[in-house]
Amino acid sequence: MKKYNRIFTIVVDSLGIGETEDSKEYGDIGVDTLRHISESVESFNIPNLQKLGLANLHSINHVEPVEKPLAYFMKMKEASVGKDTMTGHWEMMGLKIEKPFQTFTDTGFPQELLDELSKRTGRSIVGNKSASGTEILDELGEHQIKTGDMIVYTSADSVLQICGHEENEIFGLDELYRCCEIARDLTLKDEWKVGRVIARPYVGMKKGEFKRTSNRHDYALKPYGTTVLNTLKDNGLDVISVGKIKDIFDGEGITESNASKSSVHGMEQTLEIMDKDFKGVCFVNLVDFDALWGHRRNPIGYAEELEKFDVNLEKLLNKLKEDDLLIITADHGNDPTYKGTDHTREYVPFLAYSPSMTGNGLMETSNSFATIGATIAENFEIDMPKNTIGQSVLEKLL
């Protein structure tokens, strides 16, 4: 069987392609991130995704299917319970999450947790509600500058987020990270457990001028079991992460990490990594689609971000070697035309391409995201870890 020396797996964060049979159980009716983005703009220029076969896989306004797509493609349905970042990525690497991470979206965090966090950090706490990052800064940024109080908030995800002004005399990065480490320790308790604690540094001095910086840091839970990434690393293969992949897996199974300032930067980093001689996986997360456009319900911004991605995708396609494999996918949906600000439970795309391929076309829908991890494992002739899921499609990539 043909083996690939390098596999580039790119997660276009939140690029869902239509509701699943169980979407209604998650409050998501009629959702379709990609389709609804395309219906919100007057033109949509993604020629390289089109060339791979994205419009053959799923109906996209302004983008026609092509007669001979370059890639193999299919829809994947999440087997795990949930629709968040960690669940999606962990499943890609073989873990099925049976119990969703708890959220505090509607209630805020328990007073007992806040009291303990305040006591251990020595700071008063304001916020304690679900909000977008821009909203919470406009509301409480000036207050923090005056008082030094810690801004704590959450979202539709299983997260506890803390905002801190980057300038030391006001709050400072070191102090923000210290507070987040304390929060992570506290939220390991079952009744307070969240998937991630996120440090959200910002700059600016008044409402309307506050901006979050790229010094964000995620303090994630370790995966609940051994993933394909661990097995790759244990077998001497390279696992190079770009974007928030390292944070999502709490560093487990990663041999080299690259933090990104934006999704465009993430693609630029990936293009640089392509010049390296390595054997293994480059695992990329491009978060701006989700963070800047999906949650903020901005379909036009989302479409423009996809067009920027497509420009760099052309460069990537041109740099692929005969023994490279490219996989493009997503971790959940986030329909920017849907009510609220939450992720949406959707199918995600699987596009697989190598310059050495002689075939192409539609494959049968996968019943889990773990197809990715299983395919990677078979390619590098390593066993799937115990208690993992996933069926490889390597033999179908001709």
Curated annotation (Swiss-Prot):
> Superkingdom of the source?
Bacteria
Per its UniProt record, the required cofactor names are: Mn(2+)
What's the EC number here? 5.4.2.7
The record's annotation in InterPro entries points to: Alkaline_phosphatase_core_sf, DeoB, Metalloenzyme, Phosphopentomutase_DeoB_cap_sf
Which pathway does the UniProt entry assign to this protein? Carbohydrate degradation; 2-deoxy-D-ribose 1-phosphate degradation; D-glyceraldehyde 3-phosphate and acetaldehyde from 2-deoxy-alpha-D-ribose 1-phosphate: step 1/2
- Gene3D superfamilies, alphabetized: Alkaline Phosphatase, subunit A (3.40.720.10), Phosphopentomutase (3.30.70.1250)
GO BP, one annotated term: metabolic compound salvage
Give the top-level enzyme category: isomerase
GO molecular function terms noted in the UniProt entry: magnesium ion binding; manganese ion binding; phosphopentomutase activity
Q: Which residues bind Mn(2+) 2?
A: 290, 295, 343
- Where is the protein localized? Cytoplasm
Q: Where does the protein principally reside?
A: cytoplasm
Catalytic reaction equation(s): 2-deoxy-alpha-D-ribose 1-phosphate = 2-deoxy-D-ribose 5-phosphate; alpha-D-ribose 1-phosphate = D-ribose 5-phosphate
GO CC term, one of those recorded: cytosol
**What is the recorded function of this protein according to its Swiss-Prot or TrEMBL entry?**
Isomerase that catalyzes the conversion of deoxy-ribose 1-phosphate (dRib-1-P) and ribose 1-phosphate (Rib-1-P) to deoxy-ribose 5-phosphate (dRib-5-P) and ribose 5-phosphate (Rib-5-P), respectively.
Family assignment from sequence similarity:
Belongs to the phosphopentomutase family.
Full protein name: Phosphopentomutase
Q: What organism is the protein native to?
A: Clostridium tetani (strain Massachusetts / E88)
